[in-house]
Structures are given as structure tokens and as C-alpha cells.
């Protein structure tokens, strides 16, 4: 049984549509779409704990982390389920997303349905921060402010 989900991201100047598809429980999830209005460069991209945007993106809570691990990069074994690394916005402020992730699940007990997808202002350091940035790096990747977010919702097959 395959699953299709969507997140419509909104922020003050940033917007986008992200689609999720998973063929069966335990298989990788494909994450694709486009986000506009970003500053050129790298931006942290994460699934957050709550599907709550009542107080903007801050209501989304911390990164989705059902296994209580430290923050890491998308290819690290030690990472939050929600750690999707960085997306890249071009000179026009548009980021094209095409990710396949084995940790993000649409089916099963740790589904991301109803949780929030957040894009951040800054580059995610992937848990590799040093010195006075190390503690925050292991929680958030020092990715900065939340510039847009949306709730992962059920969508029609596409």
C-alpha cells in the first residue's frame, strides 16, 4: 500500500509545496517539490515534532526525534528522524527538492503525518558544530530562524 502526502509551506516571504511518497512501510520516502523566496544558499530542512502552526513555525516544536538521538546529517546513523540536511536555493531564491530518505516514514508507528516540515534561514551544520556552537549543533544544527513551515497532510495520489 503506497502513501502520498503533501506539505504546503508558508512564511513571511517564503512559500512552497513539498510532496512525499512511500511505496510500503519500511521503504524509503521520496520528498520532492519547490520552495520560493529564500535567500540564495543553504537552508536547514527538517520534520518537526508537532503539526501546530498556531504561533507560526515556533509552535512546531523540536525536530521529530522518536529514538532520542542527537542531531546529524541525512546520511548519519546518529540523527533525528526529522533531519533532512540542507536544501540549496539558487540565485533566484528557489530551491528544488529531490530527496530519498529511509528514516522518514509515511506508514507505520513513526509516521510524519500530522507533523510539520520546516525550512530554516541558515545552513544546518549537520551536528558538526564546535566550540560554543557544539551543544546547539547536537540539537538543531544551528540552522537559525524558521522561515517557513507546513503540516504534512494526506493527499490524493499523483
UniProtKB/Swiss-Prot annotation:
Keyword field: Antioxidant, Copper, Cytoplasm, Disulfide bond, Metal-binding, Oxidoreductase, Zinc
GO molecular-function terms, A-Z: copper ion binding; superoxide dismutase activity
Assigned EC number: 1.15.1.1
Cofactor note: Binds 1 copper ion per subunit. Binds 1 zinc ion per subunit.
EC class: oxidoreductase
PROSITE patterns in the record: SOD_CU_ZN_1 (PS00087), SOD_CU_ZN_2 (PS00332)
UniProt name for this protein: Superoxide dismutase [Cu-Zn]
InterPro entries: SOD-like_Cu/Zn_dom_sf, SOD_Cu/Zn_/chaperone, SOD_Cu/Zn_BS, SOD_Cu_Zn_dom
Binding site for Cu cation: 46, 48, 63, 120
Cofactor: Cu cation; Zn(2+)
Function: Destroys radicals which are normally produced within the cells and which are toxic to biological systems.
Amino acid at each position: 500500500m503506497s502513501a502520498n502526502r503533501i506539505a504546503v509551506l508558508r512564511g513571511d516571504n517564503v512559500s512552497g509545496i513539498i510532496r512525499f511518497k512511500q511505496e510500503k512501510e519500511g521503504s524509503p520516502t521520496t520528498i520532492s517539490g519547490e520552495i520560493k523566496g529564500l535567500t540564495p544558499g543553504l537552508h536547514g530542512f527538517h520534520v518537526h515534532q508537532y503539526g501546530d502552526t498556531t504561533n507560526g513555525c515556533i509552535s512546531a516544536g523540536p525536530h521529530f526525534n522518536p529514538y532520542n538521538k542527537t542531531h546529524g546529517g541525512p546520511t548519519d546513523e546518529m540523527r533525528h528522524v526529522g533531519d533532512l540536511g540542507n536544501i540549496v536555493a539558487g540565485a533566484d531564491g528557489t530551491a528544488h527538492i529531490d530527496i530519498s530518505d529511509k528514516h522518514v516514514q509515511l506508514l507505520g508507528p513513526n509516521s510524519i503525518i500530522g507533523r510539520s516540515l520546516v525550512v530554516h534561514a541558515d545552513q544546518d551544520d549537520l551536528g558538526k558544530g564546535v566550540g560554543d556552537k557544539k551543544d546547539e549543533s547536537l540539537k538543531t544544527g544551528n540552522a537559525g530562524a524558521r522561515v517557513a513551515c507546513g503540516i504534512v497532510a494526506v493527499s490524493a495520489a499523483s
